[in-house]
Amino acid sequence: MIINAKGPASFAEKYIVRSIWENKFPPGSILPAERELSELIGVTRTTLREVLQRLARDGWLTIQHGKPTRVNNFWETSGLNILETIAELNPDGFPELVDQLLSARSSVSAIYFRGAIRNSPDEAVVALANINELEDTAQAYADFDYALQHTLAFSSGNPLYVLILNGFKGLYSRVGRYYFSSAEARALAMDFYKQLQQLAIDKNYTDVPALMRTYGINSGVMWQSLRDDMPVELGHSDT
């Protein structure tokens, strides 16, 4: 098992998670005793204990006082915070994971974009006020797009959408930089921003779903033309 890690704790975490992913520690099974596992991985028991607590918080494990540590079915117990980890564990499935991520984000954003322009149209106008000065670079568009999503999610009146969006952040930001490296993708987005801006100015929230649907289809087609050339490095976080 080849694991790239920046320290003992990172190594231990990646070792255990990969072992769960590869079914060496299958769902419902009991982890080896702390002493045995620390010797197997090559870290101190203190470090291992901290890692196990973190993995339990993320839904990989169940820890109960006086009982052995049990492996969970992470698909049932974890949240969006493990997206980065799944991307690293399954590089061959990364393009499909991104497809699913973008599809989910499009479905959810259609709700909070409409909510933002219905409940806080002036905030949407402010968020879109400087689009004509947006630097024509992948980084600038990726940063602006995420900031816009975040602002409108918060302005929708339901802060839970912000938490959902936060779960996408790391992976979405990296994919966004790649997507917006296409001049056509940037032009498509700018056209969308301008139409959205006009709806916000007009306080016309009823037409937002149709605009979101059209942009979702067009950006989806654009993504399909780019996905096969996506660098594998996009699936790796910096940790």
UniProtKB/Swiss-Prot annotation:
Q: Which domain of life is it from?
A: Bacteria
| InterPro entries with a match to the protein in the record | FA-response_TF_FadR, FadR_C, TF_FadR/GntR_C, Tscrpt_reg_HTH_GntR, WH-like_DNA-bd_sf, WH_DNA-bd_sf
| Molecular function as annotated in GO | DNA binding; DNA-binding transcription factor activity; fatty-acyl-CoA binding
Gene Ontology process terms (BP): fatty acid metabolic process; regulation of fatty acid metabolic process
One family from Pfam that matches here is GntR
Q: Where in the cell is it found?
A: Cytoplasm
Q: Where is the HTH gntR-type domain?
A: 6-74
Quote the DNA-binding region ranges, renumbered to this chain.
Answer: 34-53
Write down the PROSITE patterns for this protein, in alphabetical order.
Answer: HTH_GNTR (PS50949)
Q: Which GO terms describe its cellular component?
A: cytoplasm
| Keyword field | Activator, Cytoplasm, DNA-binding, Fatty acid metabolism, Lipid metabolism, Repressor, Transcription, Transcription regulation
Oligomeric form and interacting partners: Homodimer.
Question: What NCBIfam families is this protein classified in?
Answer: fadR_gamma (TIGR02812), PRK04984.1 (NF003444)
Q: What does it do?
A: Multifunctional regulator of fatty acid metabolism.
- Descriptive protein name: Fatty acid metabolism regulator protein
